[in-house]
């Protein structure tokens, strides 16, 4: 699937499967980033 068709699908149906998967991936990446930052903070301050 090309980027243009993906944008077209995501704009016409926000509740599409691709958007749900992308949202979950972004949530997981954000959680991992926060965990990494907290671990780095503990390592630096200890």
UniProtKB/Swiss-Prot annotation:
Q: Give induction info.
A: Expression is regulated by MYEF2 and MYOD1.
Q: Which residues cross the membrane?
A: 22-42
The record places the following residue ranges in the Cytoplasmic compartment, namely 1-21
Q: Which GO terms describe its molecular function?
A: enzyme inhibitor activity
> InterPro entries in the record, alphabetically?
Myoregulin
Membrane topology qualifier: Single-pass membrane protein
Q: Which GO terms describe its biological process?
A: calcium ion import into sarcoplasmic reticulum; negative regulation of calcium ion import into sarcoplasmic reticulum; response to wounding
Source species, domain of life: Eukaryota
Q: In which tissues is it expressed?
A: Specifically expressed in all skeletal muscles. Detected in both fast- and slow-type skeletal muscle. Not expressed in cardiac or smooth muscles.
Identify the keywords attached in UniProt to this record, alphabetized.
Answer: Membrane, Sarcoplasmic reticulum, Transmembrane, Transmembrane helix
Cell compartments where the protein resides: Sarcoplasmic reticulum membrane
Topology check: give the Lumenal ranges. 43-46
User: How does gene deletion manifest?
Assistant: Mice are born at expected Mendelian ratios and do not show obvious morphological abnormalities or differences in body or muscle weights. They however show enhanced Ca(2+) handling in skeletal muscle and improved exercise performance.
User: What is one GO cellular-component annotation here?
Assistant: endoplasmic reticulum membrane
What job does the chain carry out? Inhibits the activity of ATP2A1/SERCA1 ATPase in sarcoplasmic reticulum by decreasing the apparent affinity of the ATPase for Ca(2+), thereby acting as a key regulator of skeletal muscle activity. Its high expression in adult skeletal muscle, suggests that it constitutes the predominant regulator of ATP2A1/SERCA1 in adult skeletal muscle. Also inhibits the activity of ATP2A2/SERCA2 and ATP2A3/SERCA3.
What is the protein's quaternary organization? Homooligomer. Monomer. Interacts with ATP2A1/SERCA1. Interacts as a monomer with ATP2A2/SERCA2; the interaction inhibits ATP2A2 activity.
Name under which the protein is recorded: Myoregulin
Give the organism the record lists.
Mus musculus (Mouse)
What gene is this protein translated from? Mrln
């Amino acid at each position: 699937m090309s980027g243009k068709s993906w944008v077209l699908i995501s704009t016409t149906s926000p509740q599409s499967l691709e958007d749900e998967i992308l949202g979950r991936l972004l949530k997981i990446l954000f959680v991992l980033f926060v965990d990494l930052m907290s671990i780095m903070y503990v390592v630096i301050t200890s």
